[in-house]
């Protein structure tokens, strides 16, 4: 990759404590837990383990920062934008370190981690620009009255971050939240807290006042639950599984009816018609299934291929999988790293076993890769998969591509929609009528046409059905972090 700075294979671990009120502090109970390198299964470091008491401290810091008359509340909206621009500049300055640290903690290839940070910078700058433009309206009403709306921050937002894209998902949530003037409590995934803690130090350097940003590492069952049920948190944003998302929503509703944004599980279809460039479609379907080792909510694991090109597509897909470079994520030609931890590693292998037991044909992979440790699984390709198999219905979250035949457009639309999930879908064809029918009929939050895995700060992202509620990115995300206040007052005389 041209212009890619060299990675640091042994990045210094600079911050391992909880960040509250612009200070790094020990946990209230003094506990710590080990962070593991998925490439080696060895410990990277110990990080302070947050608890309910630490979440309470972070929320209290937010409450003080959000009081009327504080520097944060009195700050001009344009100044909030300047802080986000400054944060983006600091990300850019430290991009090699952030990418190296993300690679160490997640095992994802360095070049992928680098692209994640590039996207983070773009998102920060996009929402920096929105800070003084998220305005209300003047509304014509009957009689001698004047009406207008104000967009105000929700208040204290709890942001629960997943382990598959730690920096990316943190930025997707915190950038619009801060642009709108909220205070935040960030709970990174217990597996991947290191870049979030370093990011906290950059927030202070950028000039965010104390208490505006707080980062509390810890386990979801403790810290995540505490955020979801906290009576002083006004909004929770969660990315993770549908199963846990339901628990978050229940806790949010049964506590103080806090606002809830959920980006949840997916089982995304990729549809290939014979009029497309076959080599390009094979390559795109390959990346759709195997990007980030399949650890994506938008992973295109279900590939529906027209029956007239199916056998050739299977052949070329296997050839593509054999060429995928697995190994040291710091090597710039590495495309494939480990799964995040032992639990996920075991879960994926169990899914592969169940597919074979149910009659799917294993064409490539299906095993642990290498004998030097690490949670590596080979890129795995199955053919002759039926829609009623467990592996075709449930989210795998691993490097498994399922290749299935279809007859015609109506057939494949019905099969795409025959899922509890609705995160994303893709179609490869040159027929505009087919494209329009597909995009209108398929029930997903995003549809890619002749591409996959492209998103932009300006465009919203989120799921239908049990893939979630609300949207991240774009103008739509600002709605998730604002309250709309309607003001109506009598005037002596209205003139048009």
From Swiss-Prot:
CDD domains: ALDH_F1AB_F2_RALDH1. GO terms for molecular function: oxidoreductase activity, acting on the aldehyde or oxo group of donors, NAD or NADP as acceptor; structural constituent of eye lens. It comes from the Eukaryota. Lens. Keywords: Eye lens protein. Omega-crystallins are structural components of squids and octopi eye lens. Contains relatively little if any DHAL activity. Belongs to the aldehyde dehydrogenase family. This is Omega-crystallin.
């Amino acid at each position: 990759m041209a212009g890619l700075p060299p990675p640091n294979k042994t990045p210094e671990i600079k911050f391992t404590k909880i960040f509250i009120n612009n200070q790094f502090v020990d946990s209230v109970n003094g506990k710590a837990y080990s962070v593991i390198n998925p490439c080696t299964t060895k410990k990277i470091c110990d990080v302070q383990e947050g608890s309910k008491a630490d979440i309470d401290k972070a929320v209290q810091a937010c409450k003080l920062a959000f009081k009327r008359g504080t520097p944060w509340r009195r700050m001009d909206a344009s100044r909030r934008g300047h802080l986000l621009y400054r944060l983006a500049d600091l990300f850019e300055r430290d991009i090699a370190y952030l990418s190296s640290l993300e690679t160490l903690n997640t095992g994802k290839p360095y070049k992928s981690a680098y692209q994640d940070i590039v996207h983070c910078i773009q998102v920060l700058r996009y929402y920096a620009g929105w800070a003084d433009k998220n305005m209300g309206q003047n509304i014509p009403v009957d009689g001698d009255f004047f009406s207008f709306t104000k967009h105000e921050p929700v208040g204290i937002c709890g942001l629960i971050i997943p382990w598959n894209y730690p920096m990316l998902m943190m930025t997707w949530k915190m950038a619009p939240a801060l642009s709108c003037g909220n205070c935040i409590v960030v709970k990174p995934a217990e597996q991947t807290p290191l870049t979030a803690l370093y990011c906290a130090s950059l927030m202070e350097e950028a000039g965010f006042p104390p208490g505006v940003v707080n980062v509390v590492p810890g386990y979801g069952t403790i810290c995540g639950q505490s955020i979801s049920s906290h009576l002083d948190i006004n909004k929770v944003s969660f990315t993770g599984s549908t199963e846990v998302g339901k628990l978050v929503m229940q806790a949010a509703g049964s506590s103080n009816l806090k606002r809830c944004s959920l980006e949840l599980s997916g089982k995304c279809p990729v549809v290939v018609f014979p009029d497309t460039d076959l080599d390009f479609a094979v390559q795109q379907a390959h990346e759709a299934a195997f990007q980030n080792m399949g650890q994506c909510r938008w992973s295109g694991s279900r590939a529906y291929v027209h029956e007239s090109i199916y056998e050739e597509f299977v052949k070329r897909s296997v050839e593509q999988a054999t060429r995928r470079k697995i190994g040291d994520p710091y090597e710039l030609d590495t495309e494939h790293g480990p799964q995040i931890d032992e639990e996920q590693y075991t879960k994926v292998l169990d899914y592969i076993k169940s597919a074979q037991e149910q009659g799917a044909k294993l064409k490539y992979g299906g095993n642990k890769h290498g004998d030097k440790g690490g949670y590596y699984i080979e890129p795995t390709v199955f053919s002759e998969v039926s829609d009623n198999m467990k592996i075709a219905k449930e989210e795998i979250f691993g490097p498994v591509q399922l290749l299935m035949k279809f007859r015609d457009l109506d057939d494949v639309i019905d099969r795409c929609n025959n899922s509890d999930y609705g995160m994303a879908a893709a179609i490869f064809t040159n027929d505009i009528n087919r494209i329009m029918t597909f995009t209108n009929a398929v029930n997903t939050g995003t549809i890619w046409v002749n591409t996959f895995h492209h998103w932009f700060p300006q465009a919203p992202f989120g799921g239908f059905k049990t893939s979630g509620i609300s949207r991240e990115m774009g103008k739509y995300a600002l709605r998730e972090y604002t309250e709309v206040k309607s003001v109506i007052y009598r005037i002596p005389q209205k003139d048009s």
